[in-house]
C-alpha cells in the first residue's frame, strides 16, 4: 500500500523505476551520494535541502522496496541498502549543518599536547541496527556524537579576514549535534 501511495503522488517514479538499471543492483554509498547531489543541484546551499533529501529518501525507499517485493534481493542485501541510505542521509545532514555553522562561527580548533593548534574532528557513531547495517523499513537510528576536545574555540579559516563570532568547541559541537538531529527529524517528518 505504501509503495502504491508514493507512486500515485510521484508518477515520475514509474518511468524511473521502469528503467532496467534502476532495479538491477544495489547502490553503493558513493552512488547514493552522487544521486542525491545530482537531485539537490542548486538547492544544496539552501534550507530546501531537507525537502530534497526527504524526496530522495522516499524515492530510494521505493526502489529498495520494489527490489525486495519483486524478489530481486535477499533480506540481507535489503537491510544493507536501507542502512546505506540512512548513512547517506546522515552524511548530507552533517554536511549541511557543518557548512552553516562554519560560515557563522568558523572551524573548531584545540591545542594538542605540544601546544600546536589543530582542527577538532567530529564523528557520528551508528549504534544498533544502523551500526550493524541491519536497518529495516521501520527502524529508528541510534547515534552517538563524539569530537576531539572540549577545549579550544572556533576561528575563521577564511583568508579574507571576514569577522565571525567565536564560540567554544563544546558549544560548537553541541550546536552541530542538535542541527543534525533536527535535520534528521525534518527528513523523516513525512
Map each language-model feature to its residues.
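Non-catalytic regulatory/linker segments of enzymes
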Residues: 1-190
Amino acid at each position: 500500500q505504501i509503495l502504491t501511495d508514493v507512486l500515485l503522488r510521484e508518477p515520475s517514479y514509474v518511468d524511473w523505476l521502469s528503467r532496467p538499471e534502476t532495479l538491477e543492483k544495489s547502490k553503493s554509498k558513493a552512488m547514493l551520494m552522487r544521486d542525491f547531489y545530482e537531485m539537490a543541484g542548486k538547492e544544496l546551499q539552501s534550507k530546501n535541502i531537507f525537502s530534497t533529501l526527504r524526496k530522495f529518501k522516499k524515492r530510494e525507499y521505493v526502489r529498495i522496496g520494489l527490489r525486495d517485493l519483486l524478489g530481486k534481493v535477499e533480506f540481507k542485501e535489503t537491510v544493507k541498502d536501507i542502512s546505506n541510505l540512512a548513512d547517506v542521509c546522515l552524511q548530507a545532514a552533517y554536511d549541511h549543518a557543518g557548512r552553516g555553522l562554519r560560515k557563522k562561527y568558523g572551524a573548531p580548533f584545540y591545542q594538542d599536547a605540544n601546544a600546536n593548534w589543530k582542527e577538532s574532528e567530529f564523528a557520528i557513531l551508528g549504534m544498533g541496527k544502523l551500526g550493524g547495517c541491519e536497518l529495516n523499513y521501520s527502524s529508528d537510528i541510534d547515534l552517538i556524537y563524539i569530537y576531539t576536545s572540549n577545549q579550544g574555540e572556533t576561528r575563521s579559516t577564511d583568508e579574507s579576514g571576514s569577522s565571525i563570532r567565536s564560540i567554544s568547541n563544546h558549544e560548537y559541537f553541541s550546536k552541530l549535534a542538535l542541527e543534525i538531529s533536527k535535520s534528521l527529524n525534518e527528513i523523516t517528518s513525512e
